[in-house]
Amino acid sequence: MRTFAYRDAATADGFAVGELLDDATVRDPIDGRPRPIAELTPAPALARTGKVICIGLNYRDHCDEQGVPYPDRPMLFAKFGNALIADGEPIVRPEGCQALDFEVELGVVIGRRATRVTVADAMAHVSGYVVVNDVSARDWQGAKPALAPGERGDGQWLRAKGSDTFLPMGPVFVSAGEIPDPGALRLRSWRIPGSGPDAGRAIPMQDGSAANMVFDIPALIAFVSNAITLEPGDLISTGTPAGVGVFRDPPVFLEPGDVARCEIGGIGQVENRVMDAGTQVP
């Protein structure tokens, strides 16, 4: 099943999820009538997430573009509910951040409690998939290309990756049965400048395959659940392919007015404009 999440003032929590009838129409979960998606305000596919476990350095080409070896075990970090925003909502560049970057990622949604599961059993705990954007303050993270000579950054990934609005999520959830081979999914991203000679033009950034993961989804679930029990509604954001802004020459970062677009074939996309803290971008 493929579902679409949207804002609905008629519900108790202001949130509704309907079955996608086609790319332009969703079935109203209350009365069953078809509703045009163009008339709806998207919400995150998961209205509320539990734990958000993110994986660093999990695509071979992403390691290659940094000149670092492939990790021998998954690299974990986390985001929280404060970071979650919907398609069309603004990414807020925090005060003091000058190197805002983004990454398209496949989000794996947990459907059954998982504690110390094996690789062989791991996929039985997956309910489905979403597209997410891992937004990063690269200067806070301490990524060398984002720093001026002599600067160090604070190296605090929790702050650099977990700031408010740093987890845009698309409105579409696709159940696991609809995607028998998630390793075949194509991940792409674009930056759309808000000003300058390329204003309004979608500039390709990333174009990769989930087959290029260092650790596949079963391996990630087994590794995480060995130490951290995964509950229904938890999310594993599985890493990103090459092409991110910080490792380009010269580096490319998001500026206020720019739009970040992330897309996964067979799932959908999430698109968000950047604004500075305290500044509304039209």
Each model region followed by its residue ranges:
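A short secondary-structure junction signal
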Residues: 64-66, 88-90, 117-122, 140-144, ...
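N-terminal non-catalytic cap/leader segment that marks the start of a structured domain
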Residues: 1-75, 81, 180, 188, ...
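A generic local secondary-structure boundary/capping motif
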Residues: 42-44, 65-66, 91-100, 114-121, ...
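Catalytic-pocket segment enriched in acidic/His residues
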Residues: 40, 62, 138-282
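Hydrophobic alpha-helical segments and helix pairs
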Residues: 76-129
